[in-house]
Amino acid sequence: MAKPVVAIVGRPNVGKSTIFNRIVGERVSIVEDVPGVTRDRIYNSAEWLGKEFNIIDTGGIDLSDEPFLEQIRAQAEIAIDEADVIIFITNGREGVTDADEQVAKILYRSNKPIVLAINKVDNPEMRDQIYDFYSLGFGEPYPISGSHGLGLGDMLDAVRAHFPKEEEEEYPDDTVKFSLIGRPNVGKSSILNALLGEDRVIVSDIAGTTRDAIDTTYTFDGQDYVMIDTAGMRKRGKVYESTEKYSVLRAMRAIERSDVVLVVINAEEGIREQDKRIAGYAHDAGRAIIIVVNKWDAINKDEKTINVWTEDIREQFQFLSYAPIVFVSAKTKQRLNNLFPLINQVSDNHSLRVQSSMLNDVISDAVAMNPSPMDKGKRLKIFYTTQVAVKPPTFVVFVNDPELMHFSYERFLENRIREAFPFEGTPIRVIARKRK
């Protein structure tokens, strides 16, 4: 099941980004120091009382070309469309403003749970000023201070109470769930329609457990699949449609419910920063990934074109070095018949468990070939390695001191594991822990 989505909404200068950063905390930091992993600060993962959720800072979406009220309306629309719970931020120092009332009118029609928070209530004396905010019609307001971190616990308790009840996926374990993600107009819908052609047995179109998503279930060559639609493939005409950052938000839920993610790139437009943002989220979520270059029929080519494109993709998506690349045309159906076998392959690799004895032989040989460097007179000592999870395959390396496991050596071990076992298409995790 996808994580609940929480959106932070409010007029400018009420402190939305400060509260966003407070809630996500250290999760804002870049996890991997690899070129090409682009972070977008408008969304992130957070956790409260053991429950993980995604949080959107609508104020981070660039709508500077729009009139003021249109910006507010666009933020509210994004929250209404995407969120399970909305945090409505106001400013306690300024009281209720006309802009607050404009936001309230839009949110009030949403039928979504609204948690009203009054920011910049930095001392107890200011709490007497909160009563005016009852007029906005969202019940008890929560006085908070984003800059000092005050009151956030009570606010998050209220947010968590509104999370939807968890539902189990209704599909058998051997069903492969995949999604096509990408910027607007890269051809996701065209690929989907071409895939659901005459050779496919379409079982049903049913509403998914995630709001506004359609799960298309079908069978091909005896294998059951679920194509998890991003809502953006079926909805058009919103005021924020031209805002490319928004395509990341639409992809988040589909990615989390998928086993395999097909990152679709438009060959006519080339690789854009937004392609890397979307792919980075799928990578961070630990999903199996295939890079699909669509509209291959629409560009001029010679015998070197595929190699040039492949080199460019490998350079710009260095964090996806494991992902296979397929050049397709939804229009002519060129190479589309390669997609299902590849989806099956990377799905199998995503779930692969390796024997501990073979794994430890690989690690021992790697250490013998390239011992870890000394650090302040100490050397990393590896005692043993075990696989602790799949989807993605995750390995714990028990060592004398995890601080001695440098990122470069961790990457070296990952590469040796990849050389020894079939992990094409899936990220793998290598974690150092101190042996007890």
Swiss-Prot record:
Q: Which UniProt keyword terms apply here?
A: GTP-binding, Nucleotide-binding, Repeat, Ribosome biogenesis
Query: What PROSITE patterns does the annotation carry?
Result: G_ENGA
> Boundaries of each KH-like domain copy?
352-436
Asked if Repeat is a keyword of the record, the answer is yes
A Gene Ontology BP annotation from the UniProt entry: ribosome biogenesis
Query: What's an example of a GO molecular-function annotation for this chain?
Result: GTP binding
Domain EngA-type G intervals: 4-167, 176-351
Q: Which InterPro entries match?
A: G_ENGA (IPR031166), GTP-bd (IPR006073), GTPase_Der (IPR016484), KH_dom-like (IPR032859), KH_dom-like_a/b (IPR015946), P-loop_NTPase (IPR027417), Small_GTP-bd (IPR005225)
- Kindly indicate whether the keyword GTP-binding belongs to this entry: yes
Q: Which residues bind GTP 1?
A: 10-17, 57-61, 119-122
Please tell me where GTP 2 binds in this chain: 182-189, 229-233, 294-297
Into which family does the record put it? Answer: Belongs to the TRAFAC class TrmE-Era-EngA-EngB-Septin-like GTPase superfamily. EngA (Der) GTPase family.
Q: How does it assemble?
A: Associates with the 50S ribosomal subunit.
Tell me, what does this protein do in biology?
GTPase that plays an essential role in the late steps of ribosome biogenesis.
> What is the name of the protein in this document?
GTPase Der
Organism this protein belongs to: Listeria monocytogenes serovar 1/2a (strain ATCC BAA-679 / EGD-e)
Q: What is the lineage of its organism?
A: Bacteria, Bacillati, Bacillota, Bacilli, Bacillales
